[in-house]
Amino acid sequence: MGGADNQSCRETQDVVRSGTPAQVLPVFRRDPLTGEPVQGELRWGLIPHYVDARPHIQPIHARAETITEQRMFRDAYRKRRCIVLMTGFNLKDQNGKRRVISCIDGAPFGVAGIWENWKDPLTSRWERTFAIITVPANKLIAPVHDRMPAILHNRDFGRWIGPEDNPHDLLVSYAGDDLVVSPPAGKSRRRP
């Protein structure tokens, strides 16, 4: 996923090795006041800035194909994009078995996301949340699942979190030449 254009993202120790929805995770984004890239801790599960009460359902994914049309995602897509660095992601195959997709060499990679700033009316505290953008699966992942996170090339990190309002051409299925899908994790059954 080569490239050396984003030193701050590549040199960080804050890479998601295991994350679950509602968990606070390290995310890179552009500071709206300074325009500079910053790292922060955001909660996985998007709460749109315009809602009055905490919704019961907080999406963890946003489809690239409809992100510019859906009210819940379009403002964040235009103004508040982020990158989640991870070493792999989990998908369930057709049999319900968990599969892990990672780089062959174990290197971290950046996934496109969007973030929001929401003020809780009960506590008056601000909460930053995010969702990961998904695209149709590439040919490596398609036998396991029909969707995958939008993996960014390192050279595109700055553009993704930059001020451009529609970098939609970056939301494509990653070719996957350097990705590997783990075999299904099975339970060992020992017979006497």
Regions found by a protein language model. Give the residues of each.
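Short linear sequence motif anchored by a di-proline
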Residues: M1-P192
